[in-house]
Amino acid sequence: YLLAFLLATLAVYLTWCVKKWGTIAGMVCLAFAMGIYQAYATVAIVLVLLYIIRQFVIEKLDFLEAVRKDLKYLGMLVGGAVLYAVILKITLIRYNITLPGYQGIGALGIMSLGQYKAALQKTLYHFRLILGMEHGVEKHVYSLLNAAALLLIGLILIYLLVRNQVYKKKMSMLASIAAVCLIPVGAYFINFTSPDVQYYTLMEMAVCLIYLLLIIMLLQLEWKTWISKILKGCGIFVLCGLVYYNVINSNIAYFNMNLSYHKSISIAEDVLQRIEQMDEFQNQHDKVVIMGDYN
């Protein structure tokens, strides 16, 4: 999974920094990232959206100039997906196998208008769910911190649009706002490729990049005006709170997983010892398989 994440990130990086063959190198990296784990193509999509936001809000590029520069990213994303599909097709033919129906992987393709609407609703639901806001902003720490992070992204975006006079370039302003709003769609893009996809946490890595967007925006604020001081101070506080909460939460989760692991091993060893004491057990080299569940 980490290799797939790395390759998806590398695809965008190579497309950005290598002028001559960067797009082709990016296609190859993205194709292999999708080959390892399809869902992490969304990492590349969201990174491209972050770069578009940076172009308009921070670099203050004209709309048409940015479009000309960003066509290579579209080529990388489409080309990488096509290359992955070609390699997949060749592999299926070569080994005479078919794709399983798991997670809708065997039903990728164009969906109906109603299915796209359902995919959008599912996307917004899962986006709220992973941020702890399934039923709106709730009175617990994680939900409040994420709500504050989203609010700060919106406020800092407005502040930067005004400070950098991007609002005078209406197309650039609309494009930057649209890119921010499309981040959930980009992070859950697999929803729009098959109606049978069900997201789980491991597939939602791209959602974490919204915190990278907040960091990028905070770096543009200086400790000069009272507005920027308040926004930057609140942003640092929220990010520190999220880091602390997730560190504590992760340690609790891993502690419980470790306890569960040792409990499972202990039960398996106890069952194995009883099996070895049975008269039917003749050979110490017999293979024993322990399957089932316990309460």
Predicted regions and their residues:
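Transmembrane alpha-helical segments
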Residues: 6-15, 28-32, 45-53, 153-158, ...
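Membrane-interface transmembrane helices that cradle and orient dolichyl/undecaprenyl
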Residues: 8-23, 55-61
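Signature aromatic-anchored transmembrane alpha helix within multi-pass, membrane-resident enzymes
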Residues: 23, 220-249
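Central hydrophobic cores of alpha-helical transmembrane segments
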Residues: 24-31, 175-180, 232-240
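Transmembrane catalytic cores of multi-pass membrane glycosyltransferases
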Residues: 31, 35-59, 63-205
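C-terminal transmembrane-bundle signature of multipass membrane proteins
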Residues: 112-119, 182-191, 207-222, 242-254, ...
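Membrane-embedded, lumen/periplasm-facing catalytic core of multi-pass transferases
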Residues: 242-295
